[in-house]
Amino acid sequence: MRIFNTYGPRMHPNDGRVVSNFIVQALRGQDITMFGDGQQTRSFCFVDDLIEAMVRMMATDASLTGPINIGNPGECSMLQLAEAVVRLTGSRSKLVFKPLPSDDPKQRCPDISMAQAQLGWQPQVSLEDGLAPTIAYFRRLILG
């Protein structure tokens, strides 16, 4: 199983991943750090969808071969993610653009066709539907 960009409640606030970074910065009213022009894309898989894929994989015939990509084939630009986080948190944070690291990929999106064919799985939770409980978790953690 190859896991792509999972997010959700119980993430560590300092884990260095973009979802937690943006949410923490927005809730604290800090500038949101954007690298490059924000047009690079990623896909984000809500933790509940990941767990469902794991359960299906464990319940599948042992002849299953992989690796099987588990993620969300729907892409989102970093700019779209930041704007969604600002809107959903009600933050007044500003976006600050910094140079893009030379090794940062422009696109990262899994091909989940094997998961669909062999596990009958595909993600069900939209980015915004997954961000809501994730933001609520961080709001309790950071703001009390």
PLM region spans:
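Flexible, glycine-rich beta-alpha linker
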Residues: 1-17
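C-terminal substrate-binding subdomain of Rossmann-fold SDR/epimerase-dehydratase oxidoreductases
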Residues: 5, 9, 24-144
